[in-house]
Amino acid sequence: MKTEANYMQLCLGTVQFGLDYGITGQKKPPQEYAVECLDYATQNGILAIDTAAAYGTAEEVVGTFLAKKTIPRNKLFISTKLLHNILDECPPEDYKRVIQESLYRSLRRLHLDYI
């Protein structure tokens, strides 16, 4: 599926929603606050959201937001990333399977059918 959002001027990074640093100092914000931030950002034209499996619970937070919102999916640009060391202990013949499994886990956490 292709998103209608081909070019974004701003992208909201979500590492601060899932790890213990960022917008609240030394700890992650409550999920309700993070969802409010996502809602505010999207209502004000920030339709690109960046997250990652390595960002603690950030994918789950984004998923909670996306499950509650009525904004059309094709208006959003959601990006995520694999863990940096996902293939370290993996033989090359398993790369495809390991990457696919990781992406499917991200899709479940994000409540999406594509990224």
Give the location of each predicted region.
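N-terminal binding-site loop/beta-alpha segment at the start of enzyme catalytic domains
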Residues: 1-76
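Glycine/proline-rich, positively charged
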Residues: 43, 90-115
